[in-house]
């Protein structure tokens, strides 16, 4: 691949601590948007030519915004039994708000059987950026109440209150 064995440690370059909330939201969305067209890779967290899965794309976008949701990491993300989407949904330092109050930069989650299985970034105007398990590349889509076998959670996660 031309990448060192440490490619699993790849992290997007974050904004400085002095960045405003608006700058952070736009950095998060901008990072995800710049990955559109990147291939789907299960357990992938970039860079672009190596691909992403849904939570890897969101995790790198959070890093780009200057957020580091420890103990969730790109290393753990690659573990076969680690569920990054579920961990992001349950992360105690992110705010949960009703779906009807969603804002640009919020995270929209889907779950099946009580387990979160998919995550996307809300862009506004009922649009999201994500990649999915169906092998399609990172892209922009309309939000839907269900996604495959999973249903949207009644709340969204606001990583940048």
Describe these PLM feature segments.
Residues 1-39, 100, 149-161:
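Intrinsically disordered, low-complexity
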Residues 14-18, 43-44, 91, 106:
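Residues at structural and domain junctions
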Residues 20-24, 46-54, 97-100, 111-112, ...:
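Extracytoplasmic/periplasmic, Sec-exported soluble proteins
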Residues 24-91:
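Secreted/periplasmic proteins that engage bacterial cell-wall peptidoglycan
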Residues 43, 109-111, 157:
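Residue-level detector of conserved, well-ordered beta-strand and adjacent loop positions
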Residues 45, 133, 161:
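Residues that form or immediately flank small-molecule/cofactor binding pockets and catalytic motifs
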Residues 67-144:
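...with weaker cross-activation on analogous glycine-rich loops/strands in unrelated enzymes
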